[in-house]
A protein has these predicted regions:
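Short, intrinsically disordered, charge-balanced linker/junction segments flanking boundaries
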Residues: 564, 575-585
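Pyridoxal 5′-phosphate
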Residues: 334
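Solvent-exposed coil/turn segments that connect beta secondary-structure elements
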Residues: 492-494, 558, 578-580
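Sec-dependent N-terminal signal peptides of Gram-positive bacterial secreted proteins and lipoproteins
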Residues: 2-26
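Catalytic cores of secreted/periplasmic lytic hydrolases that degrade extracellular macromolecules
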Residues: 23-326, 337-473, 481-491, 497, ...
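Residue-level "contact hotspot" at macromolecular interaction interfaces
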Residues: 126, 470, 565-566, 579
Length: 585
């Protein structure tokens, strides 16, 4: 009986092995040698010619030899190898861009790893298929189509699998040449190469009425029949820098360091988009009445789940320490202006639980207000908890820093939310050239890895600023005041009794805007945007007369409240004995 059972079991095992072998044969690498024929049996060094083909310059026995030869031949030179998964067979180039193609390993998103460290704690992020990557170099190649490249993914300095990208020299972009990309997909998407004309991401300065603006344009890496791909993003992302010239196109690898050339060699200046890098621990200055006005201006009616939610977002801001404008515009983006199926049927404005691989897993809430409060008070809170592995800063940012690193696969997620916030600000100001949220507070970037945040000047350390053990980029803070060579900042973390409060897995916790503040040495912060930093007010008890040259008027007691006016007349102002519970008059 036992022998018979063994024989019976062997049949399905053999069948399974045959199935796997057949599957392997079906998914075996296609050579695509007919697209761009090669003249070398090993490593071929070529230059891209004006028709989009390759002129052979030499054959080499190793990748190292070929790579060295390529570097002597200028920007149009490449190394090609027959074992490459890409139809062009390019495995290295002197200048160009890459496009994500995770389908070669059955993925719908591409995971990339922090460059320059072998630590098991190296940071990672992920992007959608067919998205642009700024190429730096090919760092390894095994002769069988596998290797690694060094590239930049929306600011994130990355190590990326060569198998899962297609390399495109800038010659194809500059000369408007078509190139075959894709192929060797194992998940049924783009099973054969497609012909496309790639485009480089640009930032162009435009004058629109009273606003000098930055127009961001990014393209997908997929099209057919040699056409130009569709936009991955086409956005007015905010005001342009004062030094930027109308009509000029700039290039950037990280959204803030700008260059005059697509190779990003000729640096022209640094400029941080206020809405993109604004810490969420910063109060919005725009009232609830403006929220419906913004929706109406975009032809959104009362049937939207976002209608009449202005007070809800401002209450969430007051209770949980999340900027109401940025929270609202995130909801606009995630919920399709409050009209998506998740918003209408589940009161889910933020896509919680809806993963790229399983969108139907999305959460349901009993009301819109509940969904907003849970997002602000619990879910998003952990993305700006410095102890959480998803923490990369408290701004929306990009793939280098901010909530966008781990929150979404969209490489332009932070820019899309920034664009909506800027649009909201203009509408609130009736397009008169003014902006309310923009530059409303001084914002700074902490310069040093693992810098300390103190409970007072020269006091005790409450927490440090690193994003884990290997990484810190663009840790932005709202600067509230200056005193004795120190900056008072709005704390990213919740604080309790002068110490960081661990919020993981806790219920709702009220964020006190006046007590959740810290101190950092002024020399450790580079101011990047906003108003001049005010001096920390001196505490006065009793009647006094203070001579001042001007007076900033705020919405409430404390520097955490927005400035609503400025008394410019020189003179004496009476300060009365009216000290508030929080210590401010």
């Amino acid at each position: 009986m036992k022998n018979r059972k063994k024989k019976v079991l062997l049949l399905p095992i053999v069948t399974m092995l045959l199935t796997l072998c057949n599957a392997y044969e079906i998914q075996a690498k296609e050579s695509y040698s007919e697209y761009y024929p090669m003249g070398c049996h090993a490593y071929e060094v070529d230059t891209v010619n004006d028709s989009g083909n390759f002129d052979q310059k030499g054959c080499y026995a190793s990748f190292a030899e070929a790579s060295n030869a390529m570097k002597q031949l200028g920007d149009d030179a490449v190394v090609r190898h027959a074992a490459s998964y890409s139809p062009s067979k390019i495995i290295a180039m002197n200048s160009g861009i890459a496009y994500s193609y995770p389908q070669r390993e059955g993925g719908i998103t591409l995971d990339v790893k922090q460059y320059g460290t072998d630590s098991i704690y190296a940071k990672t992020t992920y992007i959608e298929k067919h998205r642009e990557i700024f190429y730096t170099s090919t760092d390894s190649y095994d002769g069988n189509g596998n290797g690694t490249i060094h590239g930049t993914v929306s600011g994130f300095d990355s190590v990326i699998s060569l198998k899962n990208v297609d390399l495109v020299p800038f010659k194809f972009v500059k000369n408007n040449l078509s190139i075959y990309l894709g192929g060797n997909s194992i998940n049924g998407e783009d099973p054969v190469p497609f012909l496309t004309k790639v485009r480089k991401t640009t930032y162009t300065v435009e004058q629109n009425g009273s606003y000098k603006e930055l127009h961001f344009t990014a393209y997908k890496g997929w099209a057919v029949d040699g056409k130009v791909p569709a936009y991955a993003a086409d956005l007015i992302i905010g005001p342009a820098a004062s030094w930027m010239n109308v009509g000029t196109t700039y290039y950037s690898k990280n959204d803030y360091d700008f260059y005059s050339d697509m190779e990003c060699r000729n640096y022209v200046g640094t400029y941080y988009n206020y809405y993109q890098f604004m810490p969420l621990r910063q109060k919005s200055n725009i009232p609830a009445s403006a929220y419906n006005t913004f929706l109406q201006a975009n032809n959104v009616s009362g049937s939207s789940k976002l209608w009449n939610t202005g007070e809800m977002f401002l209450e969430a801001q007051e209770n949980y320490g999340i900027n109401a404008l940025m929270l609202f515009t995130q909801a606009v983006h995630e919920s399709g202006w409050g009209t998506s199926a998740l918003a209408m049927n589940r009161n889910n404005l933020f896509g919680w639980g809806a993963f790229d691989s399983n969108p139907n897993n999305a959460a349901s809430f009993t009301s819109v207000a509940e969904g907003i409060n849970i997002h602000a008070g619990k879910s998003l809170r952990e993305y700006i908890n410095t102890s959480d592995g998803r923490f990369f800063g408290s701004h929306f940012g990009n793939k280098e820093s901010g909530i966008s690193v781990k929150y979404a696969s969209d490489a332009y997620y932070g820019l899309k939310i920034a664009s909506l916030a800027y649009q909201f600000d203009k509408i609130y100001n009736d397009y008169d050239g003014n902006l309310t949220e923009y530059n409303s507070y001084p914002i700074g970037v902490i310069k040093n890895y693992g810098d300390a945040i103190y409970d007072s000047i020269n006091g005790n350390v409450m927490y440090t600023t690193e994003y884990g053990s290997t990484y810190q980029r663009n840790y932005t803070v709202t600067v509230l005041a200056e005193k004795d060579g120190w900056y008072k900042i709005q704390s990213t973390d919740y604080l309790e009794n002068g110490k960081k409060l661990d919020t993981a897995k806790k219920d709702f916790i009220k964020y006190d805007w006046n007590t959740n503040v810290g101190w950092i040495e002024k020399s450790h912060v580079e101011l990047i945007a906003g108003l001049d930093v005010e001096s920390e007010p001196t505490e006065i008890i009793g009647s006094a007369v203070v001579n001042v040259s001007g007076l900033r008027v705020r919405q409430g007691p404390g520097l955490g409240y927005a400035m609503v006016g400025y008394a410019q007349e020189n003179g004496a102002y009476n300060v009365y004995d009216s000290k508030q519970a929080d210590g401010y008059t």
